[in-house]
Each structure stands twice: as structure tokens, then as C-alpha cells.
A protein has these predicted regions:
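Solvent-exposed loop and edge beta-strand segments that line ligand/cofactor-binding
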Residues: 1, 11-12, 51-63, 147-161, ...
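Inter-helical turn/loop segments and adjacent helix faces that build the functional surface
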Residues: 4-9, 75-88, 151, 155, ...
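Active-site-adjacent bridging/hinge elements
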Residues: 39-48, 134-146
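Amphipathic, well-ordered alpha-helical segments in soluble domains
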Residues: 18, 64-71, 160-163, 167-171, ...
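Flexible glycine-/small-residue-enriched beta->alpha junction loops
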Residues: 65, 120-144
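Aromatic-rich carbohydrate-recognition surfaces in CAZymes
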Residues: 1-124
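Solvent-exposed, flexible loop/coil residues
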Residues: 88, 117-119, 145, 149, ...
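Catalytic cores of carbohydrate-active enzymes
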Residues: 29, 33, 101-118, 156, ...
């Protein structure tokens, strides 16, 4: 709908509202993947994670922080409307950076995020007492869940790390051009460069039949999962 925003003032207003709402949600909890309208709680309040009444579900996925940036960027590029990049946006991008860096696991092998659910579906909860399989801190960002809401096997989810790289660079452009925040923009660019370098080093598999291909998930220790998922972002 973004490409039609300049032709429909009400559509443009709605898109701006969605963007602002997404930034607000990030600031409520950057680890959550689904939110309530207000603070009414929901069916997953019994999950063993840091649930809040504003949250519907708290499955940590990298792409949950990337899509709001991508939408806001293309809205701005199409309409020229920079009003969405307010203080809420600046707080949101600060939370994005903080969360991505926490999930690089450099300072803490486990990170602050943990998730368990009483369920019959193995992929609806995390192994290892809610921490997931271990990862080696190599510069990649850990994602507990895939865009499908299924738990990752190895937490360095490659397509979502690529998505983080492009999203951080979009954020840097906004911060430089609109907000005049070069230091914050530089932080985004530096993290994007670090993740991209790590992807080239750790996400490539030398397949006996197909040669060099990207793995779907890796852990930094040398384990690689060769598959793709129907959801986006995917390797395809």
C-alpha cells in the first residue's frame, strides 16, 4: 500500500499510524512478537518468560525489529513524510541496537531472553531450560524463533541476520538525514558491517554437490542446518 500513499490521504495517515504504533510496541518490549491493543493480557500469559499485560506473545524473532524499520524507510522515501521519525523512533532504534547487541552474546553466553511454554509441540518452546542451543559469540545475532514462530535449531538464523544488516543501514540513513544523529547512525552501520562480515565467514557451507551455499542456521561452533523455510525472510 505504500506506493499508493501519495494518492490517498487517508491511506497515508493510516500507514503513519501503523509505523508509530510499531515503534511504540518496540519500546514496550523489543523481544515480543505480538501485542495487545492495551493491557488486557492474553492466552500466553502463563509462558515462562518476562510477560507483560501489553503482550500477546513473547517469541523473540530478529525480523520483528526489522520490518518496522523497512516499512518506515519506504514510507519516508515514497511520501517524503519524516514526521514518523520522532522521539518514539529514536527510543525504538536505541532499543533495537541494545537488543541486537545483547543477542550477539558477547558479554553473556545466554543473554537476558528465556522462553518456555507447556505444549505438545516441540517447536513452540525453547530447549536447554528455555535458553535454546548454545551459540559461540562470533558477531552474528541470535534469534530464538523463526518468522514461522517455530523455535530455531541453531540460533544464528542466517536470513534474519541478512535482514538485520539491510535494516540497520536503512536506519542509519534515516538517522543521518532526518534526525541528524551521526553517532547513532554510525553505531547502526558498524553493527551492520560486523554482522555482514560474520555472515560471510560463518554462514557459508561448502556443499559436496552444489558448492558454496548459505546455511539456514548456524551456531558459530561449526554446526549448520541446510534447509529453507516458506516464511520470509528466507534464504530464497
Amino acid at each position: 500500500y505504500v506506493q499508493l500513499a501519495n494518492k490517498d490521504p487517508e491511506l497515508k495517515k493510516m500507514l503513519a499510524g501503523v509505523i508509530n504504533r510499531q515503534f511504540k510496541c518496540i519500546n514496550i518490549d523489543p523481544y515480543a512478537n505480538a501485542f495487545n491493543m492495551n493491557s488486557e493480557g492474553g492466552e500466553w500469559m502463563s509462558d515462562l518468560t518476562d510477560m507483560k499485560p501489553e503482550l500477546h506473545e513473547r517469541k523473540w524473532e530478529i525480523d520483528s525489529l526489522c520490518y518496522p524499520i523497512r516499512l518506515a524507510y519506504h514510507y519516508w522515501k515514497t511520501t517524503g513524510d519524516a514526521s514518523v521519525f520522532s522521539d518514539e523512533w529514536l527510543q525504538a532504534i536505541a532499543n533495537v541496537l541494545k537488543t541486537f547487541k545483547e543477542q550477539q552474546r558477547k558479554d553473556d553466553a545466554k543473554g537476558p531472553y528465556r522462553f518456555q511454554r507447556k505444549t505438545e509441540r516441540a517447536l513452540d518452546t525453547m530447549t536447554n531450560d528455555g535458553w535454546g542451543n548454545p551459540v559461540k559469540p562470533v558477531g552474528l545475532i541470535a534469534s530464538a524463533f523463526r518468522p514461522s514462530d517455530d523455535a530455531t535449531t541453531f540460533q544464528f538464523l542466517v536470513p534474519s541476520n541478512f535482514f538485520a544488516v539491510t535494516s540497520l543501514r536503512k536506519a542509519a540513513e534515516i538517522l543521518n538525514t532526518v534526525n541528524k544523529k551521526p553517532a547513532l547512525a554510525k553505531e547502526c552501520t558498524a553493527l551492520a558491517d560486523e554482522v555482514e562480515k560474520a555472515l560471510k565467514k560463518y554462514a557459508v557451507c561448502n556443499h559436496p554437490k552444489y558448492g558454496k551455499i548459505y546455511a539456514f542456521e548456524v551456531d558459530g561452533f561449526g554446526n549448520q542446518l541446510l534447509m529453507d523455510d516458506a516464511n520470509v525472510p528466507s534464504l530464497l
